Amino acid sequence: MVLTGCGAAPAAQGGFVGGDGSLTIVAPDQRTTAPQITGELLGGGTFDSATLSGQVVVYNVWGSWCAPCRKEAPALEAAARRTAGRATFVGLNTRDLDQAPAQAFVRAFDITYPSVFDPDGRELLKFGTDLPPSAIPSTLVVDAQGRIAARVLGEVTEATLVGLVDDVAAGK
């Protein structure tokens, strides 16, 4: 079961489970294979994570309705730019029932990396129970061997994300 939510503030507690900012780093010999993520991209086109084989991939789970997602969006875009060439960023937009609000979010925050449109959470469920993105926002870092190396539940900072990408790209 994947529990999703938005924020930890009392105003955001209307039945959602928010992230607490916890960071889980998985030792290379303990990592499990990330699922193959496929789907329609916001704005058109399709995505298949198999095309990113051999690359460090950062997945960020977000929703246009999520206040912590709006707060972290500039940090994610900055980290994506700073780590270009070392990691590929992919958004996983969830629980937006149509693309219009999600596309408005992408435009408002000048997000340059692609996002998979996953309104029913089908792609999120592929992560299973080992290290699921069980809050919104959540961020997962996948190593070049296709294994989940790190997870952040809740907002992530630019510094934390750049550090994670650098470590994972270095084989740590």
Model feature map: region roles:
Residues 1-38, 172:
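N-terminal targeting signals for export/organelle localization
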Residues 104-112, 119-172:
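Thiol/disulfide oxidoreductase modules built on the thioredoxin-like
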Residues 70-109, 119-126:
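Structural microenvironment flanking redox-active thiols in thiol-disulfide oxidoreductases
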Residues 35, 57, 136-137:
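Short loop/turn microsegments at loop-to-beta-strand junctions
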Residues 46-70, 76, 89:
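Short active-site neighborhood of thiol/selenol oxidoreductases, capturing the structured segment around
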Residues 42-43, 52, 144:
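Short, ordered coil/turn segments that flank beta-strands lining enzyme active or ligand-binding pockets
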Residues 20, 46, 99, 120-124, ...:
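Structural motif corresponding to alpha-helix initiation and N-cap regions
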